[in-house]
Curated annotation (Swiss-Prot):
UniProt record similarity statement: Belongs to the eIF-3 subunit I family.
Residue stretches of each WD repeat: 8-47, 50-91, 146-185, 190-229, 287-326
Organism of origin: Emericella nidulans (strain FGSC A4 / ATCC 38163 / CBS 112.46 / NRRL 194 / M139) (Aspergillus nidulans)
One GO CC term on file: nuclear periphery
Keywords: Cytoplasm, Initiation factor, Protein biosynthesis, Repeat, WD repeat
Listed Pfam families: EIF3I
One record GO biological process: formation of cytoplasmic translation initiation complex
Gene, per the UniProt record: tif34
GO MF terms held by the record: RNA binding; translation initiation factor activity
InterPro entries, sorted: eIF3i, WD40/YVTN_repeat-like_dom_sf, WD40_repeat_CS, WD40_repeat_dom_sf, WD40_rpt
PANTHER family: EUKARYOTIC TRANSLATION INITIATION FACTOR 3 SUBUNIT I (PTHR19877:SF1)
Places the protein is found: Cytoplasm
Protein name: Eukaryotic translation initiation factor 3 subunit I
Length: 336
């Protein structure tokens, strides 16, 4: 599995995303620009510039027409994917740490930071696809305020029915996406170990969280039941579910300030593959010189990409052995 190395950023990566078709990959870092790449060969298509601070988060609409980004300049920007122009800017009182389009692309949620007397919020913005896309609503259609512990990540469940959020204190909440009412709150991870990532399965019925407490949890979107736990030996920054095969990929590594030796092995900067059902670690992929900050899997399950503290994005297209590998139990099932 030879990786394609994408060097388009000068600073560490914050988030990467494939589009729904999987032919494009978008990456954002602390250097104020968004890069768009062909995922097949790693060729850079172009950049989207306009933000005035580090960009924390990116997401692309299901039809690959619009791109949303959230930044430390306290704004969410909406971009025309094709032309690269910024069609709308929404200003917030604090930095925006996570954006995500709803499954039908009609809304975008934005998670804002708790700072300077402002509480952390989850704002929902309605998206209009008419004309040149500039005619967008000024105000959020819904605002959820996190009074207890601020949300660090959030996403939409199946059919956009619930908004699921991961918090700084290690808990996961479920909100009604129409009213904003909190329906459920579960202490999924160790108290005060924040949740760094939350990614859904393709059908959005379950999701995976990655936390500073060195574990990832597979949870149900309907009732927040913890279905599986994957234990690692390093704080986790990102976790993704692979379609096609029953695996999960976890990424992390010691924070830069905690690393005492520079050996890549020492810092545990590998992508780890676990079996989704049996919770066993089945392999690792080395490469990054520094912690992995973000992982995203190709929607067809044929590749995955990781972005690191080292400023590189690595795209791995899976080889045949990856698809052939099976547990004895799985082989038995096939024979029946």
């Amino acid at each position: 599995m030879r990786p394609i190395l994408l060097a388009g950023h000068e600073r560490s990566l914050n988030q990467i995303k494939f589009n729904r078709d999987g032919d494009l990959l978008f990456s954002v870092a602390k250097d104020k620009i968004v890069c768009a790449w062909w995922s097949a060969n790693g060729e850079r298509l172009g950049t989207y510039s306009g933000h005035l601070g580090a960009i924390w988060t990116v997401d692309v609409s299901p039809n690959t027409v619009l791109l949303a980004t959230g930044s430390a300049d306290n704004s969410v920007r909406l971009w025309n994917v094709k032309t690269g122009e910024c069609v709308k800017v929404w200003e917030f009182p604090t930095a925006v740490k996570r954006v995500e389009f709803s499954p039908d692309g009609s809304k975008v949620l934005a998670v804002t930071e708790k700072r300077m007397g402002f509480l952390g919020t989850i704002a929902v913005l309605d998206i209009n696809y008419d004309g040149d896309f500039t005619n967008q609503a000024e105000e959020p259609s819904l605002r959820i305020t996190c009074t207890e512990s601020k949300a660090t990540v959030a996403g939409w469940s199946y059919l956009g029915k619930y908004i699921i959020a991961g918090h700084e204190d290690g808990s996961v909440s479920q909100y009604d996406a129409k009213t904003g009412e909190q329906l459920e709150n579960v202490q999924a991870h160790e108290f005060d170990h924040q949740i760094n990532d939350l990614q859904f399965s393709p059908d959005r019925t379950h999701f995976l969280t990655a936390s500073k407490d060195k574990s990832a949890k597979l949870m149900s979107s309907r009732n927040l039941a913890i279905l599986k736990t994957y234990v690692a030996d390093t704080p986790l920054n990102s976790a993704a579910i692979t379609p096609k095969k029953e695996y999960v990929i976890l990424g992390g590594g010691q924070a830069a300030m905690d690393v005492t030796t520079t050996s890549a092995r020492q810092g545990k900067f590998e992508a780890r593959f676990y079996h989704k059902v049996f919770e066993d670690e089945i392999g690792r992929v080395k490469g990054h010189f520094g912690p992995l900050n973000t992982i995203h899997v190709h929607p067809a399950g044929t590749a995955y990409a990781s972005g690191g503290e080292d400023g590189y994005v690595r795209v791995h297209h899976f080889d045949k052995p990856y698809f052939d590998f099976m547990y004895e139990v799985e082989r038995e099932q096939l024979r029946r």
